[in-house]
């Protein structure tokens, strides 16, 4: 059991849990990073899924938070997400429908920080 900001959560060491944040819009990416860092996570930013999931940062990531605009080729999304091999929280625009991606939990934009932090905690804990 590990404490994160005074909370105990499963067997995951949240103090060292890296979250890969993928968003092409720098301001949005930094906003997501700020919310997650305030929840005690370490964050690594990338602009697009194709580069993020093959980067050295992907090896140390506990999960990824991906803006739907960061997916250049939706036809390859399942292959990319499967190759990442870790849980993904997919931030979806209200009007976009995503293909069925078993490793992805959907969170509709816009959202507040707390639902995102809870989603990250839940997907990381689900890996154990």
Where are the predicted features?
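Acidic, metal-coordinating helix/loop segments flanking the phosphotransfer/catalytic sites
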Residues: 46-63, 71
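Short, structured coil segments at secondary-structure junctions
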Residues: 39, 84, 101-102
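Conserved phosphotransfer microenvironments
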Residues: 29, 60-85, 93-95
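A structural preference for short, hydrophobic beta-strand core positions in alpha/beta folds
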Residues: 45-46, 90
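Alpha4 helix (beta4-alpha4-beta5 surface) of REC/receiver domains from two-component response regulators
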Residues: 76, 90-109, 118
């Amino acid at each position: 059991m590990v404490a994160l900001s005074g909370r105990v959560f499963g067997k995951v060491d949240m103090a060292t849990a890296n979250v890969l944040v993928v968003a092409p819009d720098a301001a949005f990416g930094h906003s997501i990073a700020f919310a997650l860092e305030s929840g005690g996570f370490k964050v690594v930013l990338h602009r697009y899924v194709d580069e993020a999931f093959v980067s050295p940062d992907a090896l140390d990531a506990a999960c990824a938070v991906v803006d739907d605009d960061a997916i250049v080729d939706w036809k390859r999304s399942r292959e990319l997400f499967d190759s990442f091999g870790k849980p993904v929280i997919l931030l979806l625009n209200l009007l976009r429908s995503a293909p069925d991606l078993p490793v992805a939990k959907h969170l509709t934009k816009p959202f507040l920080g707390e639902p995102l932090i809870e989603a990250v905690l839940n997907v990381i804990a689900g890996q154990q």
